[in-house]
Amino acid sequence: PEIPVRNDKPLEVFAGGTGMMLIKRKVFDKLKKKVPSYENDVVDQAGSIGIKEVIHEYFATSIEPETNRLLSEDYHFCRLWRMNGGKIYIAPWMDLGHMGSYLFEGTFLKVD
């Protein structure tokens, strides 16, 4: 069945690509205790250790337990956020494009 979509109001979705996603800092602050982390100890060419920053694994591939489906980094992040009480929204009035090995372009709303 078709679901009516307004072109002036964000729409809640299950997941989306993070390449054009606006994510508030508080999302990362909330999730950082829920994900694996590691203290950077990479040695540079001069033999000294760089900044010992903590790196959090927000974006990883995973297997979704309920469906046994492989989740890309984008979908893994969206699932992680939803599992911690968050919601994902799209702006249906936006036209998006992504260029990598292939060009992807699209719009959520079909305009007659």
Describe the predicted segments one by one:
Residues 1-61:
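Conserved catalytic core of nucleotide-sugar-dependent glycosyltransferases
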Residues 34-112:
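C-terminal catalytic/acceptor-binding lobe
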